[in-house]
Amino acid sequence: MLTVAMPKGRIFSEALALLKQAGYDIPDDLEHSRKLMIDVPSEQLRFILAKPMDVVTYVEHGVADVGIAGKDVLLEEERDVYEMLDLRISPCYLAVAGLPNTHVHPIAPRVATKYPNIASTYFREQGEQVEIIKLNGSVELAPLIGLAERIVDIVSTGRTLKENGLVELERIVDVTSRFIVNPVSYRMQDRAIERMVDRLTYAIEKVGENDEN
């Protein structure tokens, strides 16, 4: 039985739809279950539901053989996992945003973000020295209360930025969800994992063909 770590929330719904597209017999009530660990004996799968940032931890430490994680999490965490497949679901991107016509402090302006490693790397590559302030939620609030001049955050539709009077300043990197694998699990259960990769690849291509039509 393969243990699959899945992120709760929007990605979970899209991932389940992709698994069904790949031919997996997923119970219809799985998406609405309150359980955090769910077995699907007919497919020899066990699902662990976790916060997005925790999925890579479960896979890295081997309590999950495989998992689904956003590219943003993989870039931020830099964990020892194999990134096997771009699932092409939950597309979004990381961006720098702030209030329009904001005066940026000339010496180490402050940037609030849930992604301190990504933000630090980005501004360093831009040759800009900044002070990174790590937040765990409501990053958009930081410029409004004077905590930071800019933020680095995930943008999907841009609606949250607009509703809070913020504008996108720079686009950093595109993000989609990825299929990740524990290195030891890959050696021990390579056939089962490769079969899952093949089925998901087929589903991704099928979805792509439908989108083109």
From Swiss-Prot:
Name by which UniProt lists this protein: ATP phosphoribosyltransferase
Record-linked PROSITE patterns: ATP_P_PHORIBOSYLTR (PS01316)
Catalyzed reactions per annotation: 1-(5-phospho-beta-D-ribosyl)-ATP + diphosphate = 5-phospho-alpha-D-ribose 1-diphosphate + ATP
Subunit structure: Heteromultimer composed of HisG and HisZ subunits.
Family as reported in the entry's similarity comment: Belongs to the ATP phosphoribosyltransferase family. Short subfamily.
Enzyme class, spelled out: transferase
Any Gene Ontology biological process: L-histidine biosynthetic process
EC numbers, comma separated: 2.4.2.17
Protein encoded by which gene: hisG
Keywords: Amino-acid biosynthesis, ATP-binding, Cytoplasm, Glycosyltransferase, Histidine biosynthesis, Nucleotide-binding, Transferase
NCBIfam families, per the entry: hisG
Cellular compartments annotated: Cytoplasm
Keyword Glycosyltransferase listed: yes
GO terms under cellular component: cytoplasm
Role of this protein: Catalyzes the condensation of ATP and 5-phosphoribose 1-diphosphate to form N'-(5'-phosphoribosyl)-ATP (PR-ATP). Has a crucial role in the pathway because the rate of histidine biosynthesis seems to be controlled primarily by regulation of HisG enzymatic activity.
GO molecular function, one term: ATP phosphoribosyltransferase activity
Pathway the protein contributes to: Amino-acid biosynthesis; L-histidine biosynthesis; L-histidine from 5-phospho-alpha-D-ribose 1-diphosphate: step 1/9
InterPro entries: ATP_PRibTrfase_cat, ATP_PRibTrfase_CS, ATP_PRibTrfase_HisG, ATP_PRibTrfase_HisG_short
UniProt cross-references to CDD domains, sorted A to Z: PBP2_HisGs
Record remark on domains: Lacks the C-terminal regulatory region which is replaced by HisZ.
